Design a protein with these regions (language model features):
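Juxtamembrane transmembrane-helix termini
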Residues: 37-40, 98, 102-105, 191-195, ...
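Short, membrane-interfacial amphipathic segments enriched in basic
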Residues: 1-4, 194-206
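Juxtamembrane/transmembrane-helix boundary motifs in multi-pass membrane proteins
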Residues: 3-4, 8, 41-46, 97-101, ...
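Substrate-agnostic recognition of the 12-TM MFS/MFS-like secondary transporter fold
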Residues: 9-29, 51-88, 105-164, 174, ...
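Helix-loop boundary and gating motifs at the non-cytosolic
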Residues: 1-56, 211, 215-262
Length: 400
């Protein structure tokens, strides 16, 4: 189940990413609560807006990032991305410490961090197959999900303690420091494949990637499901602070516990994917997981019992990670090596772009209907219906 960790370079990067991801999830918890504190009754809209401005650069720049990842040393791209994100975290810590923080500053720095991720993400995703090889790629993707979701468990717990004991500054400051570990891991990578210099223009290479995806029925389906899953599913996590305050009348400690349950489920889901990756019919499993996640999200929206809500979040976290880990694996496995950076970047535009658009749309709907649970209920029903449609009609994906 951990065979990919036998590769030195992947092991170093995995450990560095785990430490950095813990810091990132600390910041996610603190930043969501910061926005609720700054914006009061408008918090649902601003949480959606923050998600939008943080992820919008994915729509704008990730395709370019994918082309660059097929032309340049991916380590250098990742290094620059991590340094920029570290600077953003430390700037937020400083602004909160001095009392100068305003909502527009949070939104601006979220956009800058998103720009860095638009170039670092394709570099990271296209580097992984070169570190472990095709045979161990599904296991590497699953392990990457495990480290990310271990951080989803550990990060909110540490954030809850840090917020209660030291305040928000500690969460942002510790996240800034955590980037040093992944930076050190990148610098320690040895004998890494560097793409050959391209003789064609960036625009032509981008067109090649788009053309390949457009003519691949399975890649089109994977890309569409990545977008739909993020658009309809991720508002569940975005609105947890609102549900904490408006439905359960609880504080940040309760919100942190909910995030921890979702993260624990996500780790369970990632471990499951590490086993599933050895089997065929990944596409069929993906559709079943998406349909199940939509159902659980609807049940969570109806729950008014803290214990039941926590249990449903655990299940939802597992199903969400299993779904997205399988879409990521399929995107990487279906892409030829020379086009992987571009193909993965197109998938990332869909997946990462679906999150801000979904957060913004769902946030606006909450302001219209006055109920975050009602919007989540609708999202769950629609997601389940779409997944079942793909499962019944096929479209080739269920046989992959």
């Amino acid at each position: 189940m951990t065979v990919a960790l036998t590769h030195r370079n992947f092991r170093l990067l995995w450990l560095g990413a785990l430490t950095s991801s813990i810091g990132t999830w600390m910041q996610k918890v603190a930043q969501a609560w910061l926005i609720v504190t700054l914006t009061g009754s408008s918090s649902a809209f601003y949480l959606g807006l923050d998600s939008f401005v943080g992820e919008a650069p994915i729509l704008l720049f990730t395709l370019i990032g994918g082309v660059v990842a097929d032309r340049r040393d991916r380590r250098h791209m990742m290094l620059t991305s991590q340094i920029v994100q570290m600077a953003v975290a430390l700037m937020l810590a400083g602004l909160i410490f001095t009392g100068a923080i305003r909502i527009w500053m949070v939104l601006t720095l979220s956009f800058i961090s998103g720009c860095a991720q638009a170039f670092g993400g394709p570099a990271y995703q296209s580097l992984i197959p070169t570190l472990v090889g095709k045979e161990h790629l599904p296991n590497a993707v699953a392990l990457n999900s495990i480290q990310f979701n271990l951080a989803r468990v550990i990060g909110p717990i540490v954030a809850g303690v840090a917020l209660a004991s030291f305040g928000m500054v500690a969460c942002f400051g510790l996240n800034g420091i955590s980037f040093l570990f992944v930076i050190a891991a990148i610098l320690a990578l040895r004998d890494v494949h560097v793409p050959a210099a391209a003789s064609v223009s960036i625009v032509d290479q981008m067109k090649d990637g788009l053309r390949y995806v457009r003519h691949s029925r399975n890649l089109m389906a994977v890309t569409a499901l990545g977008f739909i899953g993020a658009f309809l599913g991720l508002p569940l996590l975005t609105f947890l602070p609102v549900i904490t305050k408006d439905v359960f009348q609880q504080d940040v400690a309760f919100y942190s516990r909910l995030m921890t349950f979702a993260g624990a489920g996500a780790v369970t889901g990632a471990l499951t994917v590490a086993y599933i990756g050895k089997h065929r019919h990944i596409g069929r499993m993906l559709l079943i997981f998406l349909a199940s996640f939509g159902t659980i999200m609807g049940l969570f929206a109806m729950s008014r019992t803290p214990a039941l809500s926590a249990a449903l979040l655990f299940i939802a976290g597992a199903l969400l990670v299993m779904s997205f880990a399988l879409t990521t694996s399929l995107a990487q496995l279906l892409a030829p090596g020379e086009l992987r950076g571009r193909v993965v970047s197109i998938y990332m535009v869909a997946f990462r772009g679906g999150s801000p658009l979904g957060g913004l749309a769902s946030g606006w709907l909450v302001t219209q209907v006055g109920s975050a649970p009602a919007v989540l209920m609708v999202n769950g029903v629609v997601l389940t219906s779409i997944a079942l449609f793909f499962l019944v009609r096929g479209h080739g994906l269920k046989d992959v």
